[in-house]
A protein has these predicted regions:
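Nucleotidyltransferase catalytic core that binds NTPs
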Residues: 1-202
Length: 202
């Protein structure tokens, strides 16, 4: 049963995984309104644009009535205040996440004491998942089925499939050019082979 408060779930979500989806669904059962807030993260260099990520998350959470998806570029606490959120959701996958998240929670509390940080652990089946790992598996042609929502899986395959096809095409063109160059004699070699021999026949 929800308590009526608005919860903000911020992140880069590049891409949105089933771990993120699990936390979103569970947060929606606890709070009256959940806002998934997508950050641009220009320092990281993302696979999908902010607009693409927002659209993918909207599609993945379409059946969740209490969930909204927005983009933001200001401080997360400012975003929370602007959208009327009283709670900020943060996921903890493992002990290794705790130190960073604890520091961030203390900083956010200093900046905005009225916004309460709530830590949530994902379901055990998603406890190892993170976006970087999913992208690496997809980039190398691995199966990401069950790791991300279906719409995200489709877009990952399209994105990395196109990149792989382009790389194979470039490699093939380079090999063809190399083979052609190897078969074609140089101008200097051609002149040398056509010049009369100065040696006398014995």
């Amino acid at each position: 049963m929800s308590d009526g408060r608005t919860a903000l779930f911020p992140g880069t979500f590049d891409p949105f995984t089933n771990g993120h989806l699990d936390l979103t669904r569970r947060a929606a059962s606890l709070f009256g309104r959940v806002i998934v807030a997508v950050a641009p993260s220009p320092g990281k260099g993302t696979l999908f644009s902010v607009e693409e990520r927002v659209a993918l998350i909207q599609s993945a959470t379409r059946s969740m009535k209490r969930v909204e998806v927005v983009a933001f570029s200001d401080l997360v606490v400012d975003c929370a205040r602007r959208l009327g959120a009283q709670v900020m959701i943060r996921g903890l996958r493992a002990v290794s996440d705790f130190e960073y998240e604890f520091q961030m929670a203390l900083m956010n509390r200093r900046l905005s004491p009225s916004v309460e940080v709530v830590f949530m652990m994902p379901s055990q089946e998603y406890s190892y998942l993170n976006s970087t790992l999913v992208k690496e598996v997809a980039r190398l042609g691995g199966d990401v089925h069950g790791l991300v929502p279906q719409i995200v899986e489709t877009q990952l395959k399209a994105r990395y499939g196109a990149a792989s096809a382009g790389a194979r095409k470039s490699a093939g063109a380079a090999q063809t050019a190399g083979a052609s160059s190897a078969r074609k004699p140089s101008a200097k070699a051609a002149r040398k082979s056509s010049a009369p021999s100065s040696r006398k026949r014995r």
